[in-house]
């Protein structure tokens, strides 16, 4: 019964945050400008291919996007990083999953935030990246923030980690050394580059009910229930949210309540807030070596009398009833949240999607038929909600298969 309640809370939160082309090859591989593999990177509360009873985050009720792309000659892989974790932690996990090895969150970072330095060990989806090669990252929602941070760490490393390693005579992950240029392109889909005001709704809810703590406690309990991780893996090992061998439940729960995670800014919730996103934007900048593409989504209309935005018919029910009305009416002059922030896709404000602006010096340019490096190529806005763009929520008028195959074809045409 407890497992059922946990999964109900989880699925509800996933809806809050985010949450035809015939078969055969779309073009001859010999005509492509690059053969870099595609890597799919999920958003907040996302999951891997082996979780959720095989229900795919990338494809959902519409099918399997990874399989579609592979069947059409585009080598594609799916990452599975922490669904509730910060972008820093997720970027470190993505790196280890790509090249292989043990996740290293950084000695300085771990000491600062009070969690373990090392995480799980992975064989590596593309270990050859250590010797060269490039990849394309297609990221949904928070995954776009994570991808941007990964590129920044790969190329620039972390000065703080380098100085800490030298001062304390500890090892340094290659990720923090910098000088790695293996991401050819980053495509963000419905990403809250400037945050989402939905976090403000959660903050308001916390006045009456500590939602974040409830979720993390549920995650901790679920992580200790047999077989639960096979259905949904919270991947919060770095926070010690796993019961130790021989540890009584009472002792475990007391230790859980004392965890620094409850007040930490090293979480997805902070990174997805407007202030958290702005802080990230101040140091994570577009690389001149990488192409950046941004796709925006919206599923609301503007009310003539109020000026607020309301959900269109067809938006998934949870977002339409719970989230979109708040997003479509929330204004906060102190934060600079005005009428431009009201249009949304049920989870994220559309104005936040075409690239980082608050605290950022990145340039955003409309796509004119030629993709450019080092700037954000704004690919336009699609009339789909946050879940329809990845197939989790069906939309018969949106050809999701054609969308991703066309995108893969564009990425294959990029000159390294």
Swiss-Prot record:
Record-linked Pfam families: Lip_C
Keyword check for Secreted: yes
Protein's name in the database: Lipase
Top EC category: hydrolase
Catalysed transformations (reactions): a triacylglycerol + H2O = a diacylglycerol + a fatty acid + H(+)
Originating organism: Bacillus sp
Signal peptide region: 1-28
E.C. code: 3.1.1.3
Thermal dependence of function as given in the entry: Optimum temperature is 70 degrees Celsius. Highly thermostable with a half-life of 315 minutes at 60 degrees Celsius, 125 minutes at 65 degrees Celsius and 45 minutes at 70 degrees Celsius.
Positions annotated to bind Ca(2+): 314, 385, 388, 393-394
Single GO biological process annotation from the record: lipid catabolic process
Other comments on record: Is stable in polar organic solvents such as DMSO, DMF, acetone, methanol, ethanol, heptanol and octanol, which could make it as a potential biocatalyst for the use in industrial biodiesel production.
Gene Ontology cellular component list: extracellular region
InterPro entries from the UniProt entry: AB_hydrolase_fold, Lip-like_C
Regulation of catalytic or functional activity: Activity is inhibited by zinc and iron ions, and activated in vitro in 25% v/v DMSO and acetone.
